[in-house]
Amino acid sequence: MQSENYCGLLALRLLVSYHLKIHSQLDGINGNAFSIKIIVTHLFKRITRCISFVMCAIYYLQLYIKAWSSMKRYRKSLPALGVLILLGTTWTPVHTYAQIGFPDDKPAGGGGGDLTRQLATNVSTGIITGILNGTVPLQTALPILGFTNSTNQTCVCVPSGRCATTTVPTDGSGMIDVRIVTSQTSSPISPTPNIVTPPTCAAGLDRCCYPGPFQCGLQYPAVAAAKAPAAGQAYYGEYPWQAVLLGPGDIYVGSGALIDPLNVITAAHRISEYVSGARALRVRLGEWDASAASEPIPALEYTVSKFFVHPSYNAANLQNDIAMLRLSSAVPLGATPTITTACLPATSFVGTTCWVSGWGKNDFVSGSYQAIQKKVDVAVRSPADCQTALRTTRLGSTFVLDATSFVCAGGEAGKDACTGDGGSPLVCSLGGRYFVVGLVAWGIGCGTSNIPGVYVNVASYVPWITSTVSLA
């Protein structure tokens, strides 16, 4: 502030005498004297600002020269510091996109069907520069945009002051995370590892490093700047793998789960009308409050370049109700704690309490879509138990549950996914990491006692997912 006052005084001393002289001359002019006086006054204000800018530049240049001469041992760092200051004052990475609407009705608490959202339109190369090319069981890993360095560490950006509370499993669990690149597949990311020193994270985030390759299914602490969630709501960034699917006009279509930098899995029945390509579909990551104009960390949005629907998908009974969406460009994993991947399951989670999240309706009959991401805990049930429960509904006593296609969870009154949640991930925790065990598929009503919800059994489709991600 003192330097700004100094610059202003310098400019003022240069102009005040000329300014007063011209004003005294204008006072003697008849007719349009007042208009001319306003114009000249406005002109002098602009000239004053320009001179102030020049004087400030000279002032800071003098400081820089003094620092250069007095800080000999730090001279190598000063040019870089100047570049960082310049970038810090000019880079504007976000843009506001309008019109995110929910179909049929208005979101609860959203204030209307058309919502606004702040998105990151680009990712600074100063934030994401490293490429990690590791391996996981079952296949070769797709290079991950993230931070890595010469000590074979992975560094991610977490909320400031929370690195110590970010626990990373060391037992190797969850290494089934799908990341593929083969000699037959051209990847949009160079397959050659580029080992660099991790740069700094964006404002409000700290760089947190752990040994080894990038790991899926990690849940990071809440961002301090985010507002506290209400009962039944997820905290901001709690489910960083969840994707929002948007149709033309930013209409909410459904949800999905990010499983690697280029692929999102979802329920096939949610995107069947988009597969032909006649209607554009987009994927938004890092979403939480769809009614807010901005959030602490901007969301990222991608167009879907390719659709892969399971070849045995049956629209009548929703068997094999799974699809994969190929994104137009790779997601920069590690840049923020609000976007990461979920792990793919390799074991049964029957009897485990898991979580489903989304923006679907809060009631089957008269519910509204939710502006803020909701969550609910549901227990995974055995196929036999699920079939028995569903036979008590209108499905009848002859209903046979396809245990390959489906997994069931829930049955506690008032706890369930509902209309609009299609494709939302059901995730279970194992060893401190989250696995996408199911995708919301169908149900009989919502939240009825002893009637579980039915989800796509993701474990059955891991081989299909693994082979599909390798397709060009």
Curated annotation (Swiss-Prot):
It is found in: Membrane. It holds the Pfam family Trypsin. Disruption phenotype: Salivary gland extracts from mosquitoes with RNAi-mediated knockdown fail to induce migration of NIH 3T3 mouse embryonic fibroblasts. Disulfide bonds join 354-428, 386-408, 418-446. GO terms for biological process: proteolysis. Glycans are attached at residues 122, 133, 149, 152. The keyword Transport does not apply. One of its GO terms (molecular function) is serine-type endopeptidase activity. SUPFAM superfamilies: Trypsin-like serine proteases (SSF50494). One of its GO terms (cellular component) is membrane. It comes from the Eukaryota. Residues 223-470 form the Peptidase S1 domain. InterPro entries: Peptidase_S1_PA (IPR009003), Peptidase_S1_PA_chymotrypsin (IPR043504), Peptidase_S1A (IPR001314), PPAF-2-like_Clip (IPR041515), Ser/Thr_Proteases_Immune/Dev (IPR051487), Trypsin_dom (IPR001254). Belongs to the peptidase S1 family. CLIP subfamily. PANTHER family: TRYPTASE-RELATED (PTHR24256). This is Inactive CLIP domain-containing serine protease A3. It comes from Aedes aegypti.
